[in-house]
Amino acid sequence: MHAALLKAVELFNNGRFAEFQDALDSMTSTTRASSERQFYTLLKNVAEALLQLSDGDEQDAEGMLGSALRKMDEFMPRFRGLNVAALREDMQRLLGELRESRAGKRAEPAPSRLPRLRVLPE
C-alpha cells in the first residue's frame, strides 16, 4: 500500500477527519484512475459525515452515511488494500444507531464506536 494512503488511514482512525480529507485531496490530484478518484471522494464524504456527527448534526450525518453506503458496493469487498466490507459493516452499525437515537429508541446519541479503516495484508 502506498505510504500516503497508510498515513491517511492513520489520520482517519485517530479521528482527525479534516486532515484525512486534506490528505485524500492531495492523493486524488495525483491519480489518473477514475475509480481511485471516486473511492477517495467516497472516503472524504464518510469523513465529512463523521465531522458532522462530531458537531452534533445527526440528521446530516445520517444522510451522508446513507448516501456513502449506497455508493460503496462497487468497491466491495476490498479496494486499494483497504477492507471495504468491514468499513461498510461499521457504517451500517453507526447508521442504525443514529436512526435508533433519532427515533427515541436509544438514550445515548453518541455512537458506540466510530468506523475504522482496516488495511488488508498484501
Where do the language-model regions lie?
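TPR-repeat structural position
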Residues: 17-18, 58-59, 65
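Alpha-helical solenoid repeat scaffolds, predominantly canonical TPR units
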Residues: 23-24, 45, 64, 71
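TPR/TPR-like alpha-solenoid helical repeat scaffolds
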Residues: 43-47, 76-101
